[in-house]
Amino acid sequence: MLTPIQNFLKQEAAGGILLFIFATLAIILANTPLSYLYFDFLQTPVSVQIGAFIINKPLLMWVNDGLMAVFFMLVGMEVKRELLEGSLSSYQRAVFPAIAATGGMVVPAIVFLVFNATHPEFQEGWAIPMATDIAFALGVIALLGKRVPLALKIFLLALAIIDDLGAIVVIALFFSHDLSPQAFIFAGIAVAILITMNRLKITALSAYGIVGIILWASVLKSGVHATLAGVIIGFCIPLNGKKGERPLDDFEHTLSPWSAFAILPLFAFCNAGVSLIGMGMDNLTSTLPMGIALGLLLGKPLGIFSFCFVAVKLGIAKLSEGINFKQIFAVSVLCGIGFTMSMFLAGLAFGGESDSENVTALARLGILIGSGFSAVLGY
């Protein structure tokens, strides 16, 4: 089972380096005289209409709501495989990364809320520092080469997968609004078809793609965030086919390069462009970016390491062979690279605010600071 995991880790690491390049390019463009071209590009209107059904959104939203659904589909497939036969397939395997992920979600959120206790207008962003960008973190680890044992990389992967599950639950519970019963009915029908296809062990990617698009459009109109459709599709892809084939692995092999080398870099390019023009120390020291930055930089390692340490000392879990607490601490610092998922959650948290552009810019500034320092210190 290590071969697909090793392939996944290698691809995510390469994608993480590309993420860094595109994020840097976005920051540069957003702070040059050509910044208006960059921001106008993000707001380019794109419409799709079929009869009376129409979706009209700016390009930025198509990336965040549409292309990111493919990324979450891959997350769903990866979670399913790891739950059935991978690093999360038994209590003994799952308990240690699960405890680590719990600490890595709870403590950063607490740090953020402590910093923003007197600023209720910012408290919607409590989930932002909970996230870990697995591609970025693995990209940093890749720079260390063979000095990092495979067991530690698998621990990081399992932790990040559970972290993603936590983010999915947060999105479903706290970022749903203006629910539409009619759209839910169409979404329910699409899910029923996907489950039936899974039971029949249908392995055609095109079939799941067609039903998946219907599900995505229905979820988009339902008021629940559309990326959750991707997770559902991922869970419905069968692990094994009728003739011994591996459709889930095949689909992941087909889509992973598109996600790692196109979707996530494009997402980074569209979301990392924070204009620093006109920002002063009062912006940098605002409780919003400080809460996010310290949630990632301090909350993540404190939560992950302390929860792991206590769990081992109490006998609830044990360290994997070849891993020590020093390595766990280093990984916990790298988990403070929230970048992609934190940017995504920031857009959900503050997208509806009247002063959303300024608030979101401050949130992204905090993400960049916290993620940047975490990458440097973790390395």
Swiss-Prot record:
Transmembrane stretches, start-end: 14-34, 59-79, 95-115, 125-145, 154-174, 175-195, 200-220, 221-241, 261-281, 292-312, 328-348, 359-379
BP GO terms, sorted: regulation of pH
Main location: membrane
One of the record's GO molecular function terms: sodium:proton antiporter activity
Pfam family, any one: Na_H_antiport_1
Catalytic activity of the protein: Na(+)(in) + 2 H(+)(out) = Na(+)(out) + 2 H(+)(in)
Superkingdom of origin organism: Bacteria
GO cellular component, one term: plasma membrane
Residue ranges the record marks as coiled coil: none
Keywords: Antiport, Cell inner membrane, Cell membrane, Ion transport, Membrane, Sodium, Sodium transport, Transmembrane, Transmembrane helix, Transport
UniProt-listed InterPro entries: Na/H_antiporter_dom_sf, NhaA
Entry annotated with the keyword Cell membrane: yes
UniProt-annotated location(s): Cell inner membrane
Bilayer topology term: Multi-pass membrane protein
Similarity comment: family membership: Belongs to the NhaA Na(+)/H(+) (TC 2.A.33) antiporter family.
Function: Na(+)/H(+) antiporter that extrudes sodium in exchange for external protons.
Protein name from the UniProt record: Na(+)/H(+) antiporter NhaA
Native source species: Pasteurella multocida (strain Pm70)
Gene: nhaA
